[in-house]
Amino acid sequence: MRKRKLSDGVRCSARQKNRSCSGAQSSTDHEADTYGPKKKAASSNNTEKESSKKLRKDEKGPVEADENELLNKIDNAASNESSNVNDSQQSEKSITNTKDNGTRCSKLRANTRLPSSPVSDLNEVSCNGLTDDSGDGTGFIHKTCSEPSKLREIYLNGSPFVDEDSNQPMPLGLFFENADLMQDLPPAVPSCASMSRRELRNLHFRAKEEDEDDDDYVDGLANEGNI
């Protein structure tokens, strides 16, 4: 029974354990010696590839940047030219529009000008009158009228009455502005008494005689000087 137990459960001595450990270490050392240089070579190849890729990227970077800058400059120049063309066209259009508006305004002003009338002058005086509010006569205040005057309405309507609803006729001074010149008034009587025609003739002849006497006196003096 004891032999079977020993054959079934094999005992390992310390020597066998040491041998197995040394064999495992030698196998690991052999693997390290065989596969170590290969791994190092593969890692060095990978680092070289990565460095070459980086160099290529670094070389391509400035070239692409220069190309992008050139493209941006070309686009900016084209946009500036188009904007300048648009601005010039707009300025030309505005100039032509202003010229057309100026000619139209001048025509309208020439057509809408009305002859100045004394009634309008009176309205302007009444609207923009000067009133003296001080006792010394130095302070004048410029007043503007808010309501339209009746004279202007009458002048525009052309009716002979003051108001259309009333039957009161307009005074002659307003209807006929120069009524005094149109009337046949008697001649003005002078304050002093008028002289007769005889007196006027006598004065005329006396003046002539005095002139003749003066001429004779001057001729006599000239003759005496010659002698």
Curated annotation (Swiss-Prot):
Belongs to the UPF0688 family. Residues 1-122, 207-227 are annotated as: Disordered. Residues 77-104, 113-122 have a biased composition (Polar residues). Transmembrane segments: none annotated. It comes from Xenopus tropicalis. The keyword Glycosyltransferase does not apply. One of its GO terms (cellular component) is nucleus. Keywords: Nucleus. Residues 47-63 have a biased composition (Basic and acidic residues). InterPro entries: UPF0688. It is found in: Nucleus. It comes from the Eukaryota. It holds the Pfam family UPF0688. This is UPF0688 protein C1orf174 homolog. PANTHER family: UPF0688 PROTEIN C1ORF174. Its main location: nucleus.
